Amino acid sequence: QMIGFVPMNVEVAASTFENIQRFAEELEKDGIDDFDITLQGSINGGMQFRIPQKLKIEKSMGGAEGYKTLADYLEDGGNKLYLDVDFTKVYRNGNGLDTSSQIARFISNNTAVLSGYSPANGERDPESSAHLINPLSFDYIIGKFKDAAEDVGINEIRVSSMGSYLSGNYDERHELTREDTKNIVISSLENLRDSGYNLLIDGGNIYTLKYAGAVTDVPLESSGISIESYTVPFVGMVLHGCVDYSGVALNQQGSYQNSFLKSIENGAGLHYILMTEDPLLLADTSCSNYYSVSVDEWKEEIVSAYEQLSDFFYEVSD
């Protein structure tokens, strides 16, 4: 954004707590009273977040008071408000991040980076690239987060990539294999669960499911490799009745109807990525990949999809 004659990065809210609550009220009026909401990019600098050793809920969204009001409203209706907290990667310095010990290392001893790439030219995009946290730091970071979260009154968190990412650390001083990291992740999830948090996990590596209250971004289709003759709803058969689960966001797929039918086939919940403000805010930003996310555009379709899902599958779905 231009500030005078100087281009500057400015943090703006894609959704506010007040407007999210208004949308939730509209859903309830339309007969949808069983849903959960995940707040993505709502702490520590937004989508390009800092390490969660401290906790600052974005003022542009409504701050800590706005968060509490929304969380209480949803809880009164029997629904959950998950706060997205990522313990495995970080985009920015700050919040006490020690880059010498808390960032994992490649075998080359360079800091471990999860690179993002520009869809326009295929080149590495520094703005969407994240550094991977050293798994040996998970316990310390989680301890600091719990102290900060207690003051805000947070009960539900989405541990994001902890359910799908598994990286080693090849710093010769403290080398970790991916198997070592798996055991650390299990210990971290057990720590959070035993501390009273309801956990939403992405992807759902098998060793994480024991600790999940719900799982999202579950793969409901095959990889599409030509050697595979058929796609069967294997994941749905395994998870059904054990944990609440949903696939990837329907409104981010090339074929909405096909993805919707796959959700029904697998007995999965419906998952949408939405924002309450004008989607043009995302143009020419690192979040421009979130296309077609306007609440106003999708509300009618969401109500229709919920009714269809209820008609076909409600009696046997969890």
Model-derived features with residue positions:
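Aromatic-lined carbohydrate-binding/catalytic grooves of carbohydrate-active enzymes
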Residues: 2-140, 164-168, 173-174
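Generic structural signal marking isolated hydrophobic packing positions
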Residues: 27, 157-160
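Structural preference for beta-strand elements that scaffold enzyme active sites
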Residues: 34-36, 78-82, 155-158, 196-200
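Active-site-proximal substrate-binding groove within the catalytic cores of carbohydrate-active enzymes
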Residues: 87-90, 94-154, 163-318
